[in-house]
Regions:
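Beta-propeller blade termini and top-face loops
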Residues: 2-263
Length: 263
């Protein structure tokens, strides 16, 4: 349509009767920021557009988030105790200049057939959602916060009533948000969260600082303490990625973005 509107053909009769068809790009899928799997169903959230669902392990796909207030998806989770309950955190988490903000957390109780916004609209960018293994109404959200402005609606939030109310259970500072939250596979009261000091400015990007680090809670998120014991600290620590080995749940791996080579 843009081509037809902007170009004048010297010999229009050459294309009379031809039908327009999409020819590409076909190999550019954009930014995939969230994946959740429940049986044969796979959910994929794109940073630049929509939540997609496959019911046949990825053979075919369809969008299921077209009519909501935000199109950038940063997190998606399926309730382990009820696979019809889906949670989506909007606002992508790459935090680039082109990163789109979201409109909070959305929930579906019918497998994605319908959605409702359940709050945290001012969190802007959500990095992770974890749902309690036995209670689909209890969830934790890692919110990064506004990309360009220091704000307080960031950190880890918890709901115990399906999103009707939220409690900010981990807050570090107006420039430090939470980009990840991980649950211990054998103990849902043990949670780990990644705090990330980040602020994008018009002329450059601050993506590291002393506020970045890993926190742990042993009581379902009510209280947190920062972990040390070998993890890098200081002005040059950036984003951290966490992973727990399910076959050996006392083993955790951390990938640290550090501007100090010896960290």
């Amino acid at each position: 349509a843009a081509l037809a509107a902007s170009c004048t053909l010297s010999e229009p009769q050459r294309i009379e009767g031809l039908e327009w068809r999409a020819i590409g790009p076909r190999l550019c899928a954009g930014r995939i920021e969230a994946i959740a799997v429940a049986g044969d169903r796979v959910l994929v959230g794109a940073g630049s557009g929509n939540l997609w669902q496959s019911a046949d392990r990825g053979t075919s796909w369809r969008p299921i988030f077209d009519h909501e207030a935000a199109f950038a998806v940063g997190a998606v989770a399926v309730a382990p105790s009820d696979p019809e309950v889906l949670w989506v955190g909007t606002g992508e988490v790459l935090m680039a200049r082109s990163s789109y903000a979201g409109a909070g957390v959305f929930r579906s109780d019918d497998g994605g057939g319908s959605w409702r916004n359940v709050g945290l609209e001012d969190s802007y960018h959500i990095g992770r959602i974890v749902v309690h293994p036995h209670d689909p109404d209890t969830a934790w959200v890692a919110a990064i916060g506004h990309n360009y402005t220091q704000t307080e609606p960031r950190g880890v939030f918890r709901t115990r009533d399906g999103g009707a109310t939220w409690q900010q259970v981990l807050y570090v500072s107006p420039r430090v948000g939470a980009v990840d939250v991980v649950m211990h596979p054998a103990d849902p009261d043990t949670l780990y969260s990644v705090a990330w000091e980040h602020e994008r400015r018009a002329w450059h990007n601050v993506d590291h600082g002393p506020g970045s680090g890993v926190y742990v809670s042993k009581d379902g998120g009510s209280h947190w303490r920062r972990l040390g014991g070998g993890l890098p600290t200081g002005e040059l620590v950036g984003r951290v990625g966490l992973g727990i080995a399910r076959s050996q749940p006392e083993t955790m791996y951390a990938i640290v973005d550090s501007h100090e080579r010896d960290a």
